[in-house]
A protein has these predicted regions:
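A short acidic, glycine-rich active-site loop
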Residues: 52-66, 200-207
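Gly/Ser-rich helix-loop-strand patches that form or flank binding pockets
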Residues: 94-143, 240-285
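Charged docking surfaces used in two-component/phosphorelay signaling
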Residues: 84-93, 229-233
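A short, acidic, amphipathic alpha-helical segment used as a generic capping/interface helix at domain edges
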Residues: 212, 230-241
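Small/aliphatic-rich secondary-structure junction motif
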Residues: 1-51, 146-195, 220
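Nucleotide-activated donor-binding/catalytic signature segment of Leloir-type glycosyltransferases, i.e.
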Residues: 212-224
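General small-molecule cofactor/ligand-binding pocket signal
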Residues: 33-35, 81-85, 132, 181-183, ...
Length: 285
């Protein structure tokens, strides 16, 4: 293990995943390999000519390889393995290859600073290894790693996911020299808050008392433990912005089949707002 799968899409990405990924690989003591994806359609009569299609494919892959190898050379990383893949669907090859060949972290830059594209969501939904999505946003320039966990769950699968998020968050914070912050959201709809039917402060104090032992096990300072109330997607976004979190770590329960394609889970609602570099820790249902 200790292998990092770096996806290079330099011409379209919002930030340089290769440079950031290789720097992070050194911090995490992982062996990085770079994967570049390319694919193109031929139009008209040319699309039915296998020989011409093969020539075009080879030319595109060679061009991509030369560009990336030159970039690796500028980073003093000429020895880092480079693979150029001809694939229509990036996520299918990346998820399968990473799992089969023992990679334990996948790194990719997002295309836009303010939202993910379908390929990013497909990776989130299908990856079996942790996925780090990088952005270059001025909101994430703080020295903070924020993790989100569900302290109130009694579901064994969610509890295991909590532990995985904590472990990866600690490892990332230590490697990057950032301060670890932990967030737990008591989900209370805004309409209930507006009706003033609940004593919010009492609920927060009760949560701190109930989860005192787990908080102590995590080992963060008191001012780095945040129990907040509201809708997770909004609360966590606001907290990450306030902390200027460089990294945000969240667990994602992956849904397969039609249900997973139609109904986004809480993690996806959170990620649709987040502006930090996001580390997604997957789990199977």
């Amino acid at each position: 293990m200790n292998k990092m799968f770096v996806i290079a899409q330099m011409e379209r990405a919002h930030t340089d995943a290769v440079a950031h990924g290789l720097a992070l690989a050194k911090q995490l003591n992982k062996q990085a390999e770079v994967f570049a994806y390319t694919y193109a359609y031929l139009s008209g009569a040319d699309r039915d000519n296998p020989r011409l299609a093969g020539v075009a494919q080879k030319a595109l892959m060679t061009q991509q390889e030369k560009q990336l190898q030159a970039h690796l050379d500028t980073l003093d990383a000429e020895d880092v393995p480079l693979h150029v893949i001809w694939s229509k669907y990036l996520f299918e090859h990346a998820c399968s290859h990473a799992q089969r060949h023992g990679f334990d972290l996948m790194v990719k830059a997002v295309h836009h600073a303010d939202h993910y594209l379908p390929t990013d969501w497909q990776l989130i939904r299908h990856t079996s290894v942790p996925l780090l999505l990088l952005t270059n946003n001025p909101l994430n320039n703080g020295q903070t790693t924020l993790i989100s966990i569900d302290l109130g769950t009694r579901n064994p699968a969610k509890q295991r996911l909590n532990d995985a998020v904590i472990a990866h968050g600690k490892q990332l914070a230590k490697a990057t020299g950032t301060k670890l912050h932990v967030a737990y959201v008591l989900r209370i709809p805004q309409i209930v808050r507006d009706m003033d039917l609940l004593d919010i402060n009492a609920l927060v104090k009760k949560a701190y008392a109930e989860h005192k032992q787990k908080i102590a096990e995590i080992g963060v300072d008191a001012d780095c433990m945040h129990i907040i109330t509201g809708e997770p997607e909004l609360c966590l976004f606001e907290l990450a912005c306030r902390l200027k979190s460089q990294y945000f770590v969240v667990g994602a329960r992956q849904r397969q089949g039609l249900l997973g394609r139609i109904i986004g889970n809480t993690a996806e609602e959170i990620l649709s707002r987040m502006r930090s570099n996001v580390l997604v820790i997957p789990t199977e249902e």
